[in-house]
């Protein structure tokens, strides 16, 4: 690649990169609804597919409005992700997650999650703060 009369190859592009990120962007399991599928059924299916954790092993927190993340994509289309708060019934390790879609899967505290989310993603950070506040306020374990 030639840019500003300077030649770049893959090595020089990597060496001269000034990105602050060592890993791909961190996020929540999500996906598109199938035909006639409700938001909640889609969320449970995607969670199970991407994490390998059986949906019977989580409990959606009732009486809690789902969290929504709305943004404009690089294609200038508006997108909305809907997230449901849930808790694990039995703790499990991640052993069979969908490696074709997920490069890394791990448990994080809310503070670790906030650090893992990039600074420009303010809505996602706020979702983490809101969930932590609700779980603390109502002593959800």
Residue ranges and their predicted role:
Residues 1-26, 31-129, 133-134, 139-140:
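Unchanged
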């Amino acid at each position: 690649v030639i840019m500003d009369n300077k030649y770049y190859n893959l090595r020089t592009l990597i060496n001269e990169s000034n990105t602050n990120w060592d890993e791909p962007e961190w996020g929540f399991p999500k996906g598109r609804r199938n035909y006639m599928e409700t938001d909640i059924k889609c969320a449970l299916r995607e969670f199970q597919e991407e994490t390998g954790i059986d949906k019977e092993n989580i409990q959606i927190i009732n009486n809690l409005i789902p969290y929504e993340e709305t943004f404009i994509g690089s294609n200038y289309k508006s997108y909305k992700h809907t997230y449901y708060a849930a808790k694990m019934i039995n703790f499990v390790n991640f052993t069979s997650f969908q490696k074709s879609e997920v490069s890394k899967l791990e448990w994080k505290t809310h503070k670790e999650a906030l650090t893992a989310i990039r600074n420009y993603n303010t809505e996602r950070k706020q979702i983490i703060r809101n969930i932590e506040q609700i779980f603390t306020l109502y002593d959800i374990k």
